Amino acid sequence: MSMSPDEMAEALQHAFQQESQRVNEAAKRAVKKTAKETRKVVQEHFTFNNRSGKYARALTVSTEYEDSFDIRQIVNFKKNKQYLLTHLLEYGHAMKRGGRTLPFKAKAYPHMIYGQEYAEEKLPENIRKEIEKSK
């Protein structure tokens, strides 16, 4: 069977498009999976007294942007304006009686940083696994 150069180019282009689509879909699945796992990691590192549970319930995974080649998911606080507490809890803050040194500073409860580190470490690994699974 012989092919003209145009037919060969068209066949190669079609094959590359299919492979590109397969890899993109696998990467999107990996991003979604990693975002859900990251949310759990952040919640596991809540070491403060979350009396009402509003802070924990407000932590969500949301899709910031998605098209055929790209997806951006973020783990953040969407409900009840709980995002206002994140910086204060993560880094501590000055108390009413003044000062930024102990005992006049509220204790820091880092929790978001663990999620960031987890996502940075796991995302490439999850992408590789999803691509291998989709073959």
PLM feature spans:
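Aromatic/pi-system hotspot detector in well-structured domains
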Residues: 87
